[in-house]
């Protein structure tokens, strides 16, 4: 016989709700600190014991609660932060559901002490497993002191899934760092088993970041806005990149989030200068009208939903690119103590590349007619990329260097004040060539050169299929291809800049790139990957002697080139050795 439908007891319902909200000690800490911040606290102290299993205590100097409010706070769906359906659309507080405290109380032994301003005494409430055991008056300062003991004492199945005390304490520490970065105007302290692990005093965001996340990094301000969002914060140079996303601190209206749209926008902006598998150190604060973002889509509120997702994505990417494009870390500029006033950044209209590369390409081709490739009959010998024409003399980091000479015909040695600067000429030429190709592609296609004797290339079945599917991408890149029977294709013309290189190998590399990610990649990303391949093949590998004039021309071209600090694959273009480092190596005083 099938079991009857029954209404769950309040105790069991609270335990189930706690399963969504309270995953581990760090989850409890998050909810309690968010409550403290919503209460206007400017000083928050956290103590834990045994990784939070035995004890979690959060005390603050917020506005506190009356006796009645303190009792209501332990009831499910009791909150002071929303009143109506309309309030859900304009949430600006960190908490709002009224689930956290009753959920925590249902799986622990809890003691709540609170006193509001104007009251002569505070209120102390003890609860066990969600049941209130006592309510008494107590003496205390204005604020709230909340203690959680023996977490998961009545749900042993949850308890056994916790990690070691050190691991749980580390999770709490990561959370405290994120919280402290979100509110540099608030002091935070964190103790584990009586040992102080973190203490920060009120200051500005830059100081807070340098103390908690970027001790050895130079920070550069990010500030810009569009009609979709306002973006502010700081970023560190690529040298400070990490192997995980742990140093990507992103906040929406003051709330820490791990959102795929935001992370994708950040990675797209850093893609030209970061090696694969590396993630930037960045702290971004995204300000949106409350009605433009829905934070009520996930129990932990780490995920959000944007009303205008594409515009927010493009705003973040564009504002970051404005900073990264000039490679400010090469200029040795120190970030100001406070970001400058926001400057407008204009986001291009949303493109269709998010819908898949083929659909995006169709619209791109329809909107921008591609001119026929320009044909050159005679192949020309290799020469380094010509710097783009400039109406004014170029000044900047690279052109300010004094050329010493070449090392093994592969590295350019330069001097700048008290620094020796080594330039990887292949990486530098590759970046210049890439930006030239990108500009050419955007204005009608890459120059093509017809081969006097067409090459034939025997392709595999999958390679031949890739050629047929993506011929309309390969042609603007400068290739003229035609079927020659079976799986054989004839190459009649190639990009001019690779005419003297192994263009058959280049074509195979491009086909592999298209086959791997063509249908899944955004069009801009796919285009850049392909152009980076062409740029790499267009530059002579290995040793290549250069005259001083050519080296100086390359340096000037680098200053006129976007993202000049790195090659298109993310490798650094230059490396500095200071005089002090040399003196230290040679044991000089």
From Swiss-Prot:
Report the Pfam families cross-referenced here. Answer: DNA_mis_repair, HATPase_c_3, MutL_C
Q: What does this protein do?
A: This protein is involved in the repair of mismatches in DNA. It is required for dam-dependent methyl-directed DNA mismatch repair. May act as a 'molecular matchmaker', a protein that promotes the formation of a stable complex between two or more DNA-binding proteins in an ATP-dependent manner without itself being part of a final effector complex.
Q: List the disulfide bonds.
A: none
One GO MF term: mismatched DNA binding
Q: Which organism is it from?
A: Trichlorobacter lovleyi (strain ATCC BAA-1151 / DSM 17278 / SZ) (Geobacter lovleyi)
Report the GO terms under cellular component: mismatch repair complex
Gene expressing this chain: mutL
UniProt keyword terms in alphabetical order = DNA damage, DNA repair
Q: What name goes with this protein? A: DNA mismatch repair protein MutL
